[in-house]
Amino acid sequence: MTKIKLCGIKSEDDIKVINEVLPDYIGFVFAGKSKRYISFDTANTLKSKLDSRVKAVGVFVNEDIENIAHLVKNRIIDIVQLHGNEDESYINTLKAKISVPMIYAYQIKSKTDIKSVKNDTEFILLDAGAGCGETFDEALLEGFDNEYFLAGGLSIDNIKEKIMKLHPFGVDVSSGIETEGKKDAAKIRKFVSLVREVDNDR
């Protein structure tokens, strides 16, 4: 079954729909420059209302390790996603402080980027660029057999095709389930339904 991650969750209205469709993961974005940024306090409130079957992923860009450890310790997030240029030393230091899975996001623009992918974390995510809403050249994935989350430019218009062609471990969507910058309940329901439809047909 293809795992589903809905990223950029910001409001209690979003959580209500999430609890209805029950994706595997949601993403709280803690990168200050992102238009989907939320504070730690807001994330705490939203997590308290989230169905326990859905795991909350904290998305960070070069964040202070102590802040991440605080969020994990207080169970505001269940998984850590690193979306900056965090190096091996950073990852090892973070691993020593937390005991939850990590996702490392790679921006894929060339074959060289694919070759640079490492397995230093439990999961990897392949994206065209943080929050850009664009897809990357699928030909770059030829011969790549690691499990990964597919992100970048996914929507209700292309998700079935992407899953059938690329067979990712999971899919990660944000802008593709939004209308005018806000999460769209109808698009969320449709996206989740389409992913599960593909899985049921295989």
Predicted segment positions?
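Conserved N-terminal beta1-alpha1 strand-loop-helix module at the mouth
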Residues: 1-126, 131-202
